[in-house]
């Protein structure tokens, strides 16, 4: 393994990044990943970071903030490259990006049944929040 190189996504990365998200099971029918990438790239308060090992995209994170709290989405590590520190490195880069923006709190959402992801975030020092998340579909679809 060479040193992981992390930088912002560029145009040529979009399709490989979406393919990685699909391999990792991160895409959902109601969220167009291409639109999510485009939105993150055109705003000053968000970006998509890409980790490369020998030029191959092996990890990603979409990171943004609302001025007070940072959020990460689409945290992905190539399934063939797990347990090599890629996840820790891409999350550290997201934290650095938020610190540079003056953000001191980072939040994320994980499905309760995703034990592997929950263990990973616990190992990074994340704590289970006492907050309860509510949601409502504004287009009339049934809750998920």
Predicted regions: what is each one?
Residues 77, 83-96, 119, 123:
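Conserved acetyl-CoA-binding loop-helix of GNAT-fold acetyltransferases
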Residues 6, 110, 123:
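Conserved SAM-binding loop
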Residues 98-110:
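Conserved GNAT acetyl-CoA-binding A-motif
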Residues 141-144:
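Short, charged/polar, Gly/Pro-enriched secondary-structure boundary elements
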Residues 4, 8-74, 78, 91-93, ...:
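Acetyl-CoA-dependent GNAT
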Residues 108-117, 135-139:
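Conserved beta-strand-loop-alpha-helix junction that forms the acyl-donor binding cleft
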């Amino acid at each position: 393994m060479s040193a992981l190189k992390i930088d912002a996504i560029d145009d040529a990365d979009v399709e490989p990044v979406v393919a990685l998200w699909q391999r990792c099971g991160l895409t959902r029918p109601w969220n167009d990943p291409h639109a999510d990438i485009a939105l993150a790239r055109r705003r000053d308060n968000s970006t998509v970071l890409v980790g490369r090992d020998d030029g191959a995209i092996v990890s990603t994170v979409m990171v943004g903030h609302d001025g007070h709290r940072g959020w990460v989405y689409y945290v992905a590590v190539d399934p063939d490259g797990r347990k090599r520190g890629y996840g820790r490195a891409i999350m550290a880069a997201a934290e650095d990006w938020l610190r540079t923006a003056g953000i001191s709190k980072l939040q994320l959402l994980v499905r309760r049944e995703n034990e592997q992801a929950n263990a990973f975030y616990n190992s990074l020092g994340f704590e289970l929040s006492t907050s309860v998340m509510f949601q409502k579909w504004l287009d009339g679809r049934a809750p998920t």
